[in-house]
Amino acid sequence: MRDKKVTFLTQAAMIAALYVVLTFVFAPISFGEVQIRIAEMLTVLPIFTPAAVPGLFVGCLIGNITGGAMLPDVIFGSIATLVGAAGTYCLRNTNRFFAVLPPIVANILIVPFVLRYAYGVVLPIPFLMLTVGIGEVVSCGVLGNCLITVLNRYKTRIFSRA
């Protein structure tokens, strides 16, 4: 039992660290009205391990803080990632194309309002939904599905114990 808890925490911490590093490395395209947050491709990891749900939340929280995001962005952006990751976990046994939808939808519905009210972006909300949505489709949909394809080969070795 203790070994499972250690494995769960270790996987969550590693996923959080990966999210932070990817957010930092790709910072120029990870923030703003038009953004492609490469780290969001990791939101497919709840398909493989439940440890990804808290790991992604903590990673997004730390990534937003270290990226200099405003407090509402830190809070609501991280909640969007948490909701998306939890949704992916709930859909993990469905078609993988459905499993990547929750983070896309969560970010489309939350992030445009953060951009408007935290950063004062004057673009129309529907346009912000479109730009955030395109970035999420690229990161979660395209890159996330590529990650699923690669990880499916090694899932029993990487995620077998959580």
Model-derived regions, located:
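Hydrophobic transmembrane alpha-helices
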Residues: 1-47, 51-54
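Membrane-embedded alpha-helical hairpins and interfacial helices in multi-pass inner-membrane proteins
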Residues: 28-33, 41, 61-162
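Hydrophobic residues in alpha-helical membrane-spanning segments
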Residues: 47, 51, 55, 103-104, ...
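Extracytosolic (periplasmic/ER-lumenal) interhelical loops and adjacent juxtamembrane/interface segments
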Residues: 56-60
